[in-house]
Design a protein with these regions (language model features):
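Short, C-terminally biased terminal segments at protein or domain edges
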Residues: 1-49, 56-126
């Protein structure tokens, strides 16, 4: 039986949540709202993929959730860029840059996955 964990982009984004959490823990308490927004956006990417997967009987509904996942990935990138610009003493710019690169890859993978879903191509390797 096909499971959401069979989807490569889903597995890839789950791996990024730990370094995202580590980075968020370095954000000063005075910017706790930014920390919460970063974590909420990052965590919503796999959640939206999973929710869409559960509704995959309707291709339109599935695509809608995947498109929301791209939006959340892009929102995560924006929060990471804001963190870079804030120059928090404990946060390394290189760490932000690496996560930005990885979430950019996630957004691209999701876009390819949406194209595959639209064409009914087997999707486990995307």
């Amino acid at each position: 039986m096909y499971d959401v964990q069979d989807i490569k982009v889903y597995r890839n984004v789950l791996v990024l949540l730990e370094p995202l959490q580590r980075l968020a823990s370095l954000i000063p308490r005075s910017d706790s709202r930014l920390k919460i927004q970063l974590l909420n956006a990052g965590r919503s990417v796999p959640a939206q993929i999973a929710e869409g997967f559960a509704k995959r009987r309707s291709q339109k509904e599935y695509r809608r959730f995947l498109e929301m996942a791209i939006g959340s990935s892009d929102e995560t990138i924006t929060h990471l860029r804001i963190i870079q610009l804030a120059h928090f003493p404990q946060v390394k710019i290189e760490t932000c840059a690496a996560l930005i690169k990885q979430f950019t890859i996630i957004s691209k993978q999701l876009n390819k996955y949406i194209q595959a879903v639209s064409k009914n191509i087997p999707r486990s390797d995307i």
